[in-house]
Amino acid sequence: INHDPDAILLHRTNHPYTEHLQASVWDVDPVEVCKGRPVGLAWFSPDCKHFSKAKGAALVDRNIRGLAWIVLRWAGTARPRVIMLENVEEFQTWGPVRKGKPVKAKAGQTFLRWKQQLSALGYKIEHKELVAADYGAPTTRKRFVLVARCDGKPIVWPEQTHAPID
């Protein structure tokens, strides 16, 4: 599910047997899309530009900044056994916005509330900051990765496959 036709085209090229929906995530009904089938894994990568330290001085759009709330909709309706979310490390500072700017004194409050609500839906949650290059990706950027499970199985993090050059 993505609103961007270029993103859909790229994904369709790499995953031709996957069903693709070009739509806003807010307009897609998880129950309808899943057609009663169980969901093993749901992956979420909400827009990071409103959290990233590289964003500059642009004003914050609450609708985009709040995209991670869609995770709770899926968790509460389609109930994926495993949920993964990746974003920039600053995602953990998600908090209230006033006059188009994050309220620094309340940094992280929305993130904590969001995690509490996901936990209340029966998910065990763990998150880490990982460097993608340690796992073979051609970037040294640090990424926030969250894994949530509701199937009673442990969360197991992969071992690093690549090491930094000394």
Each language-model region and where it sits:
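SAM cofactor-binding core of SAM-dependent methyltransferases
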Residues: 1-27
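Class I S-adenosyl-L-methionine
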Residues: 28-41, 48-166
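Active-site flanking residues adjacent to catalytic metal/cofactor-binding acidic residues
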Residues: 1, 23, 44, 85-86
